[in-house]
């Protein structure tokens, strides 16, 4: 029996145990993990340093190295995140709805764990902690499969989690890591229907598309973030500048950063040159259409591929349009249904944008950087779903549950 199958089988067994654990037992386990993370910070950083050094030797980009890098503050933040997770209401066992039928049957819809959750993800070691702890909070066993670039960090974090769980009533095997980072192990996970209840990919478009295309297990798609901001002709100049700069430069390597700005031509003719200069001063490389180049000839001409690309870096595409309808068409054509924004003082255009643009999160006069579980008040998230079934947008704790119906009677039979 190979590693993936063996760990899948074990996870299925563990899931039957976890469903019996109380909220207090789960929270005690989370507290132990948070404490152990702090105690073993030096060990985690030592292993993370190995990944960083190997990444530099392989020529990883600065944005990829940033996603891969851990430091003392990031580990403290992860531990604090776990403590905040403890304070969140446990959705398991919640009565979603209840009613009584004329025949006397009492029916309740109850929240239950999904069972075994698979996570396949790239680069970010913090996902190892997020996925493990959110799954434990919701009573799910989890199988983690990170990328080869973060294997040392992930192995260290999971070993720390195991040492913490040994001090609690939750089995250490509640969290398992697939240490084989070859393509074969990923493909096995895609088809682990006998043991896996859902597979959640987190990473770039290529990874997500591969999982969606090849997996036979149910998939919760956390789509890539090819996000846009549309500046219409009535947009306040300073507001538009502030939002665009924040959405692009605050942390360009994350999925809710923008990759394209769409400018109404009247606004662009008045303020475009100043905006472009402001972005370039902050290290942003601009790639625009012919109308953009007419405003600033130093901008590189955008290709078709640029409109489709999640850059995850300080590269930004620029599209100039004549109408709101043209902007919406461009966004719906190239967007990844993640987060899209409009900056405008025209309520009619807001309504049109909100009705017509197909995305998980739509913003009026605000940065797309707020698409995040903590910013939405969920307190924690397993990812941001861009699909429409089961859940959409930031996936908080209820997203890792299903429901079952509990029916109580006193001898009723169907006639």
From Swiss-Prot:
Family: Belongs to the gamma-glutamyl phosphate reductase family.
Main location: cytoplasm
Key words of the record: Amino-acid biosynthesis, Cytoplasm, NADP, Oxidoreductase, Proline biosynthesis
Name listed for the protein in its UniProt record: Gamma-glutamyl phosphate reductase
Function: Catalyzes the NADPH-dependent reduction of L-glutamate 5-phosphate into L-glutamate 5-semialdehyde and phosphate. The product spontaneously undergoes cyclization to form 1-pyrroline-5-carboxylate.
A cellular component term, taken from the record's GO annotations: cytoplasm
Catalytic activity: L-glutamate 5-semialdehyde + phosphate + NADP(+) = L-glutamyl 5-phosphate + NADPH + H(+)
Organism superkingdom: Bacteria
EC number(s) on file: 1.2.1.41
GO terms classed as biological process: L-proline biosynthetic process
